[in-house]
Regions:
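Acidic beta-strand-to-loop metal/phosphate-binding motif
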Residues: 20-22
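A general structural motif
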Residues: 1, 24-29
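Charged catalytic cores and adjacent phosphate/nucleic-acid-binding surfaces used
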Residues: 6-10, 18, 27-137
Length: 137
């Protein structure tokens, strides 16, 4: 069932997960925008490699810094070639629990670059093709 952001975050925390606001200022991908600032998120994606101008990354980084919300980076890859364009640097550990604690404590840093434009265009064309197919009854 569809849940509110608050309910989703509560469920994540109830299951020992960390709640990360993914591309919060990317409005064409359902980012939560300024609502993120009032949510109990554990981290915010401040570097997402699938962008055109980078405004959403800039705003995410600004809000993350202003509100002391830990940052992460993610490739958000839809093609193999896009994997690793953005990433999160975290101190080395063998423990998943420690890794999650590092993120929550802000010991993570987002790095990376934009996905190559030809991959972004290929994805847009692929999605457009799916949307134009007639619905089957």
């Amino acid at each position: 069932p569809l849940q509110s952001p608050e309910e989703t975050i509560d469920e994540i925390h109830d299951n020992a997960g960390i709640a990360i606001a993914a591309h919060p200022y990317c409005y064409y991908r359902s980012g939560l925008g300024n609502i993120t600032q009032s949510l109990d998120v554990d981290a915010m994606e401040t570097k997402n490699s699938r962008y055109i101008l980078g405004i959403s990354n800039y705003l995410s980084k600004k809000v993350s810094n202003k509100n002391n919300i830990p940052e992460i980076g993610a490739s958000d890859a839809h093609f193999v070639e896009g994997i690793g364009c953005c990433y999160t640097e975290i101190p080395v550990t063998d423990s998943v629990d420690t890794l999650l604690k590092y993120i929550k404590k802000g010991k993570s840093t987002a790095h990376g670059k934009r996905t190559p434009m030809d991959l972004i265009i290929r994805e847009v064309i692929r999605k457009k093709g799916h949307r134009t197919k007639p619905k089957e009854n």
